[in-house]
């Protein structure tokens, strides 16, 4: 048995719920990491590992520490990325896995980096004709040109971390501070 926490012998070849042929059986579920969303990742990663085990996969939780360090168990065939925010969604962990030759869930490091960074993703969406609300990218001290109300978001942050809705001019400085 590759990962004893699953409580089943390894070597299953079909997903016991769907009957789909499995390409990999030994799965490292990466969770944690350095971001402000670490605690959410620990919970969601544990749920992913439990669900994979229930479907007959040999899955193990692999905690990525706050310094981005982790060790994959010997025999890992694929990594399931269950990390959020910095290093999880921005292409960081994906680049490390690629360098180690480990297949992983999700997109390439480059695609993750572009999608995570709103200064890169918004223009790509506009160019592709995907509807997006009016926006502007501001650096510290630059004046806003969009009329209130506005939503202020950090350029490189996941989920709703650092997001504010601004309805009055006096709310603007606090929203900018939160986004940085």
Regions found by a protein language model. Give the residues of each.
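Glycine-rich phosphate-binding loop of ATP-grasp-fold ATP-dependent ligases
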Residues: 41, 149-178
């Amino acid at each position: 048995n590759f990962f004893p926490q699953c409580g089943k012998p390894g070597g299953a070849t079909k997903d016991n719920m769907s009957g789909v042929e499995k390409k990999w059986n030994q799965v490292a579920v990466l969770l944690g990491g350095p971001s402000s969303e670490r605690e959410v990742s620990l919970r969601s990663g544990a749920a992913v590992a439990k669900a994979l085990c229930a479907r007959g996969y040999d899955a193990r939780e692999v905690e990525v520490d706050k310094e981005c360090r982790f060790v994959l168990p010997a025999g890992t065939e694929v990594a399931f990325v269950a990390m959020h925010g910095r290093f999880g969604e921005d292409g960081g962990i994906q680049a490390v896995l690629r360098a180690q030759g480990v297949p992983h869930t999700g997109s390439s490091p480059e695609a993750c980096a572009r999608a995570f960074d709103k200064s890169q993703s918004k223009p790509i969406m506009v160019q592709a004709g995907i509807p997006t609300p009016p926006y502007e990218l501001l650096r510290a001290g630059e004046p806003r040109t969009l009329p209130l109300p506005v939503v202020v978001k950090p350029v490189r942050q996941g989920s709703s971390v650092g997001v504010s809705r601004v309805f009055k001019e006096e709310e603007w400085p606090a929203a900018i501070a939160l986004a940085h």
